[in-house]
Amino acid sequence: MAKLDVFDIKNKKVGEIELSDSVFNDEVKEYLIHEAVKIQLANRRAGTVGVKNRSAVAGSGKKPFKQKGTGQARQGCRRAPQYPGGGVAFGPQAKTYNLSMNKKARRAAMRSALSLLFKNNKLTVLNNIDLDNVSTKNFVGILNGFTLDKTLVVTDVENRNLELSARNVKNVKVLKSEGLNIFDIMKYQSVIFTENSVRKVEGALQS
């Protein structure tokens, strides 16, 4: 099994942790990672753009004047595109960009992303990262001790002090293990796990 050193928040080694090979040392399938990221980003799109065509514009459908005998061009109704306030011809309509990926492929993509981080030495495991109070300075000091930047921090439980301490730090994001997703894994250059969060992620992604 793959192993990683476990550190405390002062960057002192306090032990080792065995990682599941099926989660953190799996075959890296880059095409699956690409597909999963593409789907996640597509599903964020709202697709709310839209204009009213002649059937959606409020107003009467009555013919404005008779067909013949006026000398004017024939008209069907005042909701037509050529009238002020009429509907738009061939304008953009709201659409959904949602894509889907089956659970087996989604989990395989997550395992590939985590395995890629492990093989590139971008994973750090801490025994815990509890903060007694809200302090951005203390949190930045912890990160500087590991010489990390653009970092994703994954915890096993909600840690309000940690979240508030990190929210104003550039290129840092704190997530619970349940919220871990492939886009954030690939976006951040390094990932810090707590020991318990590693076990939770392994339990969720075990093949």
Swiss-Prot record:
Transport in keyword set: no
Keyword Lipid biosynthesis recorded: no
InterPro entries: Ribosomal_uL4, Ribosomal_uL4-like, Ribosomal_uL4_dom_sf
Highest taxon listed in the record's lineage: Bacteria
GO biological process: translation
GO cellular component: ribonucleoprotein complex; ribosome
MF terms in GO: rRNA binding; structural constituent of ribosome
Keywords: Ribonucleoprotein, Ribosomal protein, RNA-binding, rRNA-binding
Region (Disordered) residue spans: 58-85
Transmembrane annotation, as ranges: none
Record's function text: One of the primary rRNA binding proteins, this protein initially binds near the 5'-end of the 23S rRNA. It is important during the early stages of 50S assembly. It makes multiple contacts with different domains of the 23S rRNA in the assembled 50S subunit and ribosome. Forms part of the polypeptide exit tunnel.
Assigned protein family: Belongs to the universal ribosomal protein uL4 family.
Record note on quaternary structure: Part of the 50S ribosomal subunit.
Protein name: Large ribosomal subunit protein uL4
Organism for this UniProt entry: Geotalea uraniireducens (strain Rf4) (Geobacter uraniireducens)
Gene: rplD
